[in-house]
């Protein structure tokens, strides 16, 4: 039902708005559907100024879309949330949410109230998470490093670097293990941001390399400076080191020309005093986000220190965190006096400028507070390097999650098929209206194995039926419970034991994607009224340039 309002806008209510929301969600899911799985296809996105992005990553695709419909925006934000929280599973979370909405709409057409559907979905989600944690998880302790490599390979399988999965999986696992540190509670932590990824196009993917230490895409400020410093004391500055000049508007009236030289000399001395304060604390590596002029460089060269200018703020923050330094935006303290203390310095075993691949880089090795690692990516062109970076980010997040949660689940649609059988049986044990909603939830989960099979050019109906038969047997017959690891083998088009094949995903990816998808679907299902206000018309007395052209006012 649509009708005018006393407010300046339109109103849609009831069935109409619900169907509209479901269609919007389905159209968003259809965009990313074909990119799911190891044989998913890539999307080329061109923005309004002509920048091209070629990607397979669900979160990136949806981030670059200009979406107007409010329900569709919810799904785009959902993918972004999954990317930030877990790092992987962004495509599947959107597909599941859209399928849940589609099936809820079918129930709505059968006159089942949305509140019953919502409570059924909540119940099904809770039960599904419990079933995963009790029956489908594999502890990583019994699998060791191989498990981490397999989880990374599974994450990369659908990406551009999947063809060299073994090479990149080892690189990712080594990088994540290199940045491990223990927090105040004694828990191991793996800050993925400590892995700096640099891209250089040219050469092949296989010439990418992992470097221990933080790699800075900068060079020393002057050729006269040392290229290697052992036992480095690092000063991190967020301001320019340049000759102090009097501010604009300051007028100095002098009668003696020699006084002019004294003023210039004093300007130089102020800068020299600043630099002496920094060097007096023992600092021998100075990193700044601003510029360093020639006069300041001369003082650093004389002191035998290494100075690097135009460091990215992001890099400076990470180096400060790793080395234990304090980033200073000014030397002035609260009293207005300029001071610099030794406690503000960070420490590293070695800072060296090296030629890696085709570029000169500065490496900061064995920092005091935390260790760091860097990956230099090589690829044919910029599009390829960007997509490789996104793929590596997903893989790094997956390995981090496996190490933190210490559990994985089989991939290839195994979890979804097992849950669909379990929830169907669970639904029949319910004697209330929620039974229908739980059964629809179970059916919705099958969209993942279905889509995987369709994208791999296989017969999805046949494959999913076989998969369900295996999982039903596993749940009915305790002697054959090992069949619960059966998932899809998409290259050969048949079911297989994915635990033996090493197709693993972190448990948290599956659990979070189920929870997030259910919550997003419920958020949209609760909407039964849309009031859209019209934009205010601006009364422009003078009119626009186009109006003037049409009226002929410019022809005089």
Curated annotation (Swiss-Prot):
It is found in: Cytoplasm, Cytosol; Cytoplasm, Cytoskeleton, Microtubule organizing center, Centrosome. GO terms for cellular component: centrosome; chaperonin-containing T-complex; microtubule. Its main location: cytoplasm. Mg(2+) binds at residue 88. It catalyses: ATP + H2O = ADP + phosphate + H(+). The modification N-acetylmethionine is found at residue 1. The modification N6-acetyllysine is found at residues 199, 400, 494. The modification Phosphoserine is found at residues 6, 544, 551. Signal peptide: none annotated. Its EC number is 3.6.1.-. The keyword Phosphoprotein applies. It holds the Pfam family Cpn60_TCP1. GO terms for molecular function: ATP binding; ATP hydrolysis activity; ATP-dependent protein folding chaperone; unfolded protein binding. Keywords: Acetylation, ATP-binding, Chaperone, Cytoplasm, Cytoskeleton, Hydrolase, Magnesium, Metal-binding, Nucleotide-binding, Phosphoprotein. Component of the chaperonin-containing T-complex (TRiC), a hexadecamer composed of two identical back-to-back stacked rings enclosing a protein folding chamber. Each ring is made up of eight different subunits: TCP1/CCT1, CCT2, CCT3, CCT4, CCT5, CCT6A/CCT6, CCT7, CCT8. Interacts with PACRG. Interacts with GBA1. Interacts with DLEC1. Belongs to the TCP-1 chaperonin family. Component of the chaperonin-containing T-complex (TRiC), a molecular chaperone complex that assists the folding of actin, tubulin and other proteins upon ATP hydrolysis. The TRiC complex mediates the folding of WRAP53/TCAB1, thereby regulating telomere maintenance. As part of the TRiC complex may play a role in the assembly of BBSome, a complex involved in ciliogenesis regulating transports vesicles to the cilia. PANTHER family: CHAPERONIN. This is T-complex protein 1 subunit alpha. It comes from Macaca fascicularis. The gene is TCP1.
């Amino acid at each position: 039902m649509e009708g005018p309002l006393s407010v300046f806008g339109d109103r849609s209510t009831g069935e109409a708005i619900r169907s509209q929301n479901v269609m919007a969600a389905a159209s968003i899911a259809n965009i990313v559907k074909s990119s799911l799985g190891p044989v998913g296809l890539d999307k080329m996105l061109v923005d309004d100024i002509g920048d091209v992005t070629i990607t397979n990553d669900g979160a990136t695709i949806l981030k670059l879309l200009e979406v107007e419909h409010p329900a569709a925006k919810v799904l785009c934000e959902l993918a972004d949330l999954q990317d930030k929280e877990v790092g992987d599973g962004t495509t599947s979370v959107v597909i599941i949410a859209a399928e849940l909405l589609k099936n809820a709409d079918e129930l709505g057409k059968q006159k089942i109230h949305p509140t019953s559907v919502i409570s059924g979905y909540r119940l099904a989600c809770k039960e599904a998470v419990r079933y995963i944690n009790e029956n489908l998880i594999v502890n990583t302790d019994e699998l060791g490093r191989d498990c981490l490599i397999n989880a990374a390979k599974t994450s990369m399988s659908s990406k551009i670097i999947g063809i060299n999965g073994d090479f990149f999986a080892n690189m990712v696992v080594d990088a994540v293990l290199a940045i491990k540190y223990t927090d105040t509670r004694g828990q191991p932590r793996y800050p993925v941001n400590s892995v700096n990824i640099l891209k250089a196009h040219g050469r092949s993917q296989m010439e990418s390399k992992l470097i221990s230490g933080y790699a800075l895409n900068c060079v020393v400020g002057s050729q006269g400076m040392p290229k290697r410093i052992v036992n480095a004391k690092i000063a991190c500055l967020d301001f320019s080191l340049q000759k102090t000049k009097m501010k604009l508007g300051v007028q100095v009236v002098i009668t003696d020309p020699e006084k002019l030289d004294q003023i210039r000399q004093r300007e130089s001395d102020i800068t020299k005093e600043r630099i002496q304060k920094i060097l007096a604390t023992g600092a021998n590596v100075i990193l700044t986000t601003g510029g360093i002029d020639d006069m300041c460089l001369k003082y650093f060269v004389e002191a035998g220190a290494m100075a690097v200018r135009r460091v990215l703020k992001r890099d400076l923050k990470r180096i400060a965190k790793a080395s234990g330094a304090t980033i200073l935006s000014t030397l002035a303290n609260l009293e207005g006096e300029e001071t610099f203390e030794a406690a503000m310095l960070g420490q590293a075993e070695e800072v060296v400028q090296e030629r890696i691949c085709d570029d000169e880089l500065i490496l900061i090795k064995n920092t005091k507070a935390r260790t760091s690692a860097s990956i230099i990516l090589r690829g044919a062109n910029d599009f390829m390097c960007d997509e490789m970076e996104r793929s590596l980010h997903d893989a790094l997040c997956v390995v981090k999650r496996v190490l933190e949660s210490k559990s994985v689940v089989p991939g290839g649609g195994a979890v979804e098929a097992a849950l669909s059988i379990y929830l169907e049986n669970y639904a029949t044990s319910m004697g209330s209206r929620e039974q229908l909603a739980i059964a629809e939830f179970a059916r919705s989960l099958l969209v993942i194995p279905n889509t995987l099979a369709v994208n791999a050019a296989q017969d999805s109906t046949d494959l999913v039926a076989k998969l369900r038969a295996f999982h039903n047997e596993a749940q009915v017959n305790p002697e054959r419970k090992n069949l619960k690891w059966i998932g899809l083998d998409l290259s050969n088009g048949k079911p297989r034991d994915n635990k033996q094949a090493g197709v693993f995903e972190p448990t948290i990816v599956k659990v979070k994607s189920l929870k997030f998808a259910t919550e997003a679907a419920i958020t949209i299902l609760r909407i039964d009224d849309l009031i859209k206000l019209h934009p205010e018309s601006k009364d422009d007395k003078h009119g626009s340039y186009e109006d003037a052209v049409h009226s002929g006012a410019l022809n005089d």
